[in-house]
Structure formats: C-alpha cells, structure tokens
C-alpha cells in the first residue's frame, strides 16, 4: 500500500485524498520560484498544499491557496493545520476564473493541469488535476495577469513541449518571460519539464538548465542546492 504521506524537514504532507501526489514537479517549483520581498502569495491549484507550505518555509508572506477539488482542499487544510505556518496560509475551494481579491499578489505560483492531448485517465479527480479541460493555459495566464501586482512575478512548471503554447497565452495578457529553466532527468536527456517565470516588465530573460540526477540516485550539486532545505536526506 502506498505511503499516505511524504515527510520533509519542517513539515509533512498527506496526499492520500488527492488525485496528484507529492512529486518532483511541485518540489521544483516550490524551491525555484522567486519569493524575494514577497508579502502576498497566491497558489493556483494547490492540491496537497505542498507548494504553499514550501513558500511559507522560505518567506514570511501571507499565502492564499485555491483548488476546485473539495477533497484536495480538505487535505491541504489538514496539512496546513499541522504545519508551523497555519496562521499564514488560507486554503479555499475556488475556481480561479471566479476568484477575486482586494489585494494583488507579489508572487503567483501554479503547477497546472497538463497532458492536454493525451487520453484521459480513469477517475474525475485525476482528470481535473492532470488535464487542461478544467483550467487551460489561456485561462491560467489570464487569471494570473488579473491578480498579479504590477511588480510581481508569476511562476509555473509545465511539460517542456507545452512551453510555446504557454508563452503565447502569457503574451496575450501582457506577461513577459523573465526566467526559464529546462529540467533534465539526467545528463544529455531531453527536458521533460520547464520552469517559467513571468513579469509585466522585463529587461532581460535568464535562460538556464537543471539536471536532477548524474546517475541513478546520484543527484547533481545544483539539484541538491535547490532542494536541500526541504528533502530529509539531502
């Protein structure tokens, strides 16, 4: 039977009620996203609450986390309640397309649905979590642009082959790429994921790569440096 939780250095995430379990994508985004000077953070499609918890560990901002799946929201609330940062994270059952806030957000993060063109997997929950039928790139970019502070940053992790589609969507709403990191599972491999950061105004775009493993269970120095504050054995 799969373990119902995943333990990090400062918090534990239960994921037995969530369609999408704790995985590398969420950890990468939670560790990579720029939170310098952040005061208000929005986590779109929070799932287990993992990324919100990582944001809370990294900075002192107030965080609002939203998801459209009721089971995920309840589980995320439980994970937040058991963490050291329950007073700074609010988890809400919300469709981001209808979400409103009196405050614009310095940082917006999302590990959005993907596999647009693949066959749907069994189960409505997992389809919501993994397919862009429920939140396509255009709606996500539009919602982020509507809620982002003029000086803020919007960060996502998506499949590498979806990058151009996401860039087109972001550009339609005045968002410009400020940082791009291709993720390679091993040296020389084609990137499977890409981390993207957007701002309304950009002087230059930083483009780099990150390799996770040098060989089986031998992690790169860059990956260790990025995630060592979270993973127990890093």
UniProtKB/Swiss-Prot annotation:
Pfam families: MTS
Keyword vocabulary terms for this entry: Cytoplasm, Methyltransferase, S-adenosyl-L-methionine, Transferase, tRNA processing
Record field: catalytic activity: adenosine(37) in tRNA1(Val) + S-adenosyl-L-methionine = N(6)-methyladenosine(37) in tRNA1(Val) + S-adenosyl-L-homocysteine + H(+)
Segments crossing the lipid bilayer: none
Protein function: Specifically methylates the adenine in position 37 of tRNA(1)(Val) (anticodon cmo5UAC).
Native source organism of the sequence: Phocaeicola vulgatus (strain ATCC 8482 / DSM 1447 / JCM 5826 / CCUG 4940 / NBRC 14291 / NCTC 11154)
Signal sequence bounds: none
Biological processes, Gene Ontology terms: methylation; tRNA processing
Similarity section: Belongs to the methyltransferase superfamily. tRNA (adenine-N(6)-)-methyltransferase family.
Classification of source organism: Bacteria, Pseudomonadati, Bacteroidota, Bacteroidia, Bacteroidales
GO molecular function, one term: nucleic acid binding
Enzyme Commission number(s): 2.1.1.223
Location of the protein in the cell: Cytoplasm
The name this protein goes by in its record: tRNA1(Val) (adenine(37)-N6)-methyltransferase
Highest rank taxon of the organism: Bacteria
GO cellular component: cytoplasm
């Amino acid at each position: 039977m799969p373990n119902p939780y995943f333990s990090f250095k400062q918090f534990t995430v239960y994921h037995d009620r969530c369609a999408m379990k704790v995985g590398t994508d969420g950890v990468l985004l939670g560790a990579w996203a720029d939170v310098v000077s952040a005061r208000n953070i929005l986590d779109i499609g929070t799932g287990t609450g993992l990324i919100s918890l990582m944001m809370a560990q990294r900075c002192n901002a107030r965080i609002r986390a939203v998801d459209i799946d009721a089971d995920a929201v309840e589980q995320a609330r439980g994970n937040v309640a058991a963490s050291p940062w329950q007073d700074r994270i609010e988890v809400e059952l919300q469709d981001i397309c209808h979400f409103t806030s009196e405050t614009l957000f310095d940082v917006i993060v999302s590990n959005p649905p993907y596999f647009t063109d693949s066959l749907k997997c069994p189960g409505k929950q997992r389809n919501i979590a993994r397919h862009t039928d429920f939140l396509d790139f255009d709606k996500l970019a539009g919602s982020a642009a509507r809620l982002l502070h003029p000086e803020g940053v919007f960060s996502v992790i998506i499949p590498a082959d979806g990058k151009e589609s996401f860039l087109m969507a972001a550009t339609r709403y005045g968002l410009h790429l400020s940082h791009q990191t291709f993720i390679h599972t091993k040296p020389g491999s084609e990137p499977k994921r890409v981390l993207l950061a957007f701002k309304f105004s950009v002087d230059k775009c930083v483009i780099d790569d990150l390799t996770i493993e040098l060989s089986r269970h031998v992690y790169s120095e860059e990956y260790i440096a990025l995630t060592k504050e979270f993973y127990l054995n890093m």
